[in-house]
Structures are given as C-alpha cells and as structure tokens.
Amino acid sequence: MPPIHHLHAAPGELPALAQGAQSGFLGTVEEKINAIFDPIATGLGDFVFGEVSLFGIGFPWIVAWLVLAGAVFTVYFGFIQVRGLRLALQVLRGRHSRKGDPGEITHFQALTSAVSGTVGLGNIAGVGVAVTIGGAGATFWMVLCGLLGMCSKFVECTLGVRYRDHHPDGTVSGGPMQYLRKGVAERLPGPAGRFLGRVLAALAAVMILLFGIGGGNMFQANQTVIQIRDVTGGDDGPLAGDGSALVLGVLLALVVGFVIIGGIRSIGRVTSRLVPAMAIVYVTGCLIVILFNITDVPAAFGEILSGAFTGEGVVGGTIGALIVGFTRAAFSNEAGLGSAPIAHSAVKTRYPATEGLVALLEPFIDTVVVCTMTALTIVIADTRLWNDAKADYAANGTTVDGVTVTSSAFETVLPWFPVVLTVAVVLFAVSTMITWAYYGQKAWAHLFGRSKLSERAYQTVFCTFIVIGAVLTFGSVLAFTDAVLFLLALINIIGLYLLAPVVKRELARFRTALRSPEERDREPAGPSGEPEAADRRA
C-alpha cells in the first residue's frame, strides 16, 4: 500500500495534476533540475516515509510517530481536547482577552492564519484518495486521528507562545526555532543542552524554509494554474501554454506579495476573512450533495462504521482502512510537525495555554469537519467513477486521481461544480501560500537575522518562486521538501515530550487565573480583540 505522503497531494497525484513545461527550454530546465533532485528525494523519502509492518500491512513509521504522540498527550493532559473544548471556544470569542495583552493578532486571527496553512488541496484530493484506497471506513480513522492530533497541537502551540521572542518593534517570533532552542536548554541545563537546543532549532528553521518554498509555495501555484487552465478548456482553451501560466503566476505573486509585506497583522486580517469564505464555499457544496441524498445519509454512516472495523473490499482489510485514514489525517492537519506554532505564537495573550486551547480547534476544523464532509459527500454520491477506481486499485494498484473522484461526487448534483472547485482551489492555494510565506520568513530570520533588507530579500525570493512554480513542476524538488518537513516531526515531538511538563504548568496557571475575581469579572472581547458591544458595562 503506497503511503500518502504529500501534505497537499498523494503519491502519484503530482504527475496527474501538476503539468509543468512540456517542451522547449523550460522543459529542459525542469528535466535537469528534477534529475539532480530525484536521487536525493528518493533516498530521503524512502527513509521519512518508510514503512513498518503492521499485521502484514505497511504503515509509514512517521505516521505511527505522530499518532502515538497524540495518544500519549491525550492521556497525559486528561483528554484536554474534550474537557477544554468549551473553554477553547470562550477564548476564541475573546472572553479571556484584554486589549493590552502582548502580541500582534487576536486568537481568531491566529487560528484562521494557521488553518489557512493546513486546509488545502489535501482536503479535496487527499480524501478522495483515502476513501478509494481505504474504503469508506478510512473516514472513521481519519476522525480518530484528528481528535488525537488536537492534543499534539495544544502542546506545541502552548510552547510556541511560552517561549516566543518579543522584539523592540512590537513584533513577536515563536515556533519550534524558539521552544527547541530555549526549552531544551532549560530542561537540560549546561553547555550540552544549550548546544543541542541551538542545533535542533537551526534544523527546524532549514526544514520549514525549504518546505515553505516547495510544497507551501510552488506546488500551490502550480495547482492553481492547472485548475484554472482545466476549467477554461484545458489544452484547447485560451489559457493553454507557458505564456498564460507565466501571467497567472505573476498575478498570484502580486496578490501574495501585497499581503505578506504587511506582516502577520496583514496576514491575520486577510485570513480572518478568506478562511471563513473558502470554508463556506466548499462546505456549502458538500451540504448540497448531502441534502439532495438525505435519505442515504444513515446508510453512508453505516458504511463508514462497518468499513472501519471490517475493511470489506479494502486491500489489507480493517488494518488497511486504519492505516490510510491515519495517514491522510496526520498529513492533513500538521499536528506535531511544528509549523502551526509559528502563526499561533503571534497571538495577544498573557497566558500561553489560552492559545494552546484555541489551537486544538485546528485539527477539528481541518480533519473532523472538512475532511469528513468530503468523505461523506463521496460515499453518499457513490459514483461509478469512485467504484471503478476502488476496483482498479484493488486489482492493479493503479494510482488514484483524488480530485477527479471528489469532483465526480459533486457533479452528480452540481454539473457546474468544476467552477466551484476552481474557486475553492484558488482560495485554498492563496491562503496556504500566505501562511507559509510567514512561516518561512520566521525561519529565514532565525538563520540570517532580522532586518528590513533581509525581510524584503526573503519576500522577493518567495514571490519569485510563485512564478517559477506556476510555470514549472519540479516534482522531485517538491517530494524532497515534503520529506524534509515531515522529518521535522521527528525532532519536534522529541522536544514536545521533553517540554510537556512546562505545558502542564502553563495550563494550571491559566486555570488558577480563571478562579480569580479579576478574571471572572473580565469584560468579554470579541474576535477582533475589542470588547463586545452587548457585553460592555455602563
């Protein structure tokens, strides 16, 4: 069973979806670059996405590592993703915020900034692959993995705020670069601990920077161009050829550049509007299909539950469904990778645990809601294309085109859905590029220092690669950056294990504050950070 090892696409989807320059000078450049990176990407990918045998079925060890961490933290923190859900929603609404709290953006803006980096093509294409390879039962295991990932996200994002750096200009920097450097040195006093912390932080910065340029940038630009080209007639349409791809790439670069120049405040303002918009567009499409087939919903849920524990018709049976579901969810919500704390650390708060609580909503939105809606839509539609794809994979191991599977489900009710899908892909891609531009900028600053010149140099490089990604595919480069990002999970989770007691103390400190008269009488604030009009006291 091939692992699903692209954050925003499955193995085999890159050739099916991303079509760079096919001939001429650009095609030659692409071939040469891919030839250089291919052996590196293959070797690193074989290690990072290597499989261990589970009842005779291959299970990517990096997925097992991520899922195990989620399970351990769930027990250690007493199922905080369940017990703390109501409090997380209160914090998100600004219930425990003050206007003068240190930071740059509100809890809501931090959440939408991070969600925009995780919700992407994986929720459209990746889920289509998962339910084709793992059957409807893979949906159940996706949800379970998402619930476990909520706790990992709580831990890493609390640490992101706890160890963030405050700069003289009022900005902050947080994430694995900070909590690995400071936290490891704190937990392991002495020169060895300080050295280890610096090395781990530098490695984290390099890994985040590389993926930010690859999967978080070039791949998104490429998919946007391909989707726009397909919906306008493909090779016979007005946007066929490298020239149109170049123009679209420049337009994307201008849009992203305009947003990221404003920093995290600008990113927060944009994502706080863009993320709800793209969620509404996509979820509405799912709901329309579900409502048109409302009588089939009980049977669909029955198929999901029975498939989870019987694995009927799935290669590998129950274990096969479990592996595919866990893999898709782990690679979709990024819980434990260390990327999301960069966005969450910019929040305005005096209590790091507040943002950890808000952050645990992220895997819930990404996996439990969006991925489940996609899977339910596919299962309910039960298209011939999906059934043929399942049979073809079971018989021949044929690569699955996840976008086609998902799109076919929508087309049963909405023949014009490719247009909606194009809008969703563009929104997902732009929001992902914006967020990963910020992640990469923080990694760049950690490696090369903070200055206006350095910042502008990075932004120029990032936007240039948007244009390059729109025209060229560089499949091997993207595979390499994917492997690098998930390698970060190895060192990040080691850091989370070491620093889990710090998170427990921060949670206790916040809960103690909640019992104080000052906190109980706190004037509620809305998502914008300002007091809600209905709650203002005379």
Residues of each region from the PLM?
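N-terminal alpha-helical transmembrane segments of multi-pass membrane transport
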Residues: 2-121, 131-138, 149, 497-538
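Extracellular/periplasmic helix-exit of transmembrane alpha-helices
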Residues: 156-164, 168, 286-303, 316-317, ...
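Membrane-embedded translocation segments of transport machinery
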Residues: 261-272, 277-345, 408
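Helix-loop-helix module between adjacent transmembrane segments
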Residues: 73-74, 115-116, 145-172, 181-222, ...
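Membrane-interface loop-to-helix entry segments
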Residues: 65-68, 72-89, 200, 204, ...
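Alpha-helical membrane segments and immediately flanking helix-loop junctions
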Residues: 100-133, 159-162, 168-184, 318-364
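Flexible loop linkers connecting adjacent transmembrane helices
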Residues: 79-107, 129-131, 135-139, 153-195, ...
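Extracellular loop-to-transmembrane helix junctions
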Residues: 55-83, 132-172, 367-373, 417, ...
